[in-house]
Amino acid sequence: SEGTQPSAVGQGYLNTPGIHTPAQVEGWRRVADAVHAERGRIVVQLMHAGRVAHPDNKDGLESVAPSALAAPGEMITAQGSFPHPVPRAVETDEVAGLVEDFVHAARCAVAAGLDGVEVHGAHTYLVCAFLSPMTNLREYLRVLTTLLHTGSIATMLAPGSRNRRAGELLG
């Protein structure tokens, strides 16, 4: 699957699926069962839209990103097409919660019987935005680059990881 939000605030586009509530887990369980009945496998792609979003597509929730920079272009909503709003820059102490959203969604995927999880890290969505000097103007960018190259980001996102210290490492 593609473009599945790990939290309500992670939704970007209209009518995209999530995998973070019990009802969503049950829905994905039905999908996984149908795929497995045909001897197939299914992997969910977790995508937190970050700044590539509009509040109208997520019940008024504000968009968040590493820095307060609007994405270029427009977002289609049920009310029409609008420029992307400027997202709220997350505070350093919120980063661990964003990581935990991905971990929770991965656990939900396991509970739903899905065969794997992929984290979407491109197109200036949240993960990509944190890793790019064009969209992350925060002072700790060098720390994130080091974490990426050492594999620590993947370790922090892994369910059951004992090495999820994003708040400590980025603070």
Locations of the language-model features?
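Hydrophobic faces of well-ordered beta-strands that scaffold small-molecule active sites
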Residues: 1, 42-44, 117-119, 170-171
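N-terminal capping/small domains of soluble enzymes
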Residues: 1-49, 98, 106
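Short glycine/proline- and charge-enriched loop/turn segments
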Residues: 12-16, 132-142
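The substrate-binding groove and active-site-proximal loops of carbohydrate-active enzymes
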Residues: 14-22, 87-96, 144-147
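Short, well-ordered coil/turn segments that N-cap beta-strands
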Residues: 33-42, 113-115, 165-169
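Structural preference for long, well-ordered alpha-helical segments within the folded cores
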Residues: 34, 101-108, 116, 160
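Non-globular sequence segments
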Residues: 41, 47-108, 112
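Acidic, His- and aromatic-enriched active-site or binding-groove loops in soluble protein domains
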Residues: 62-77, 136-154
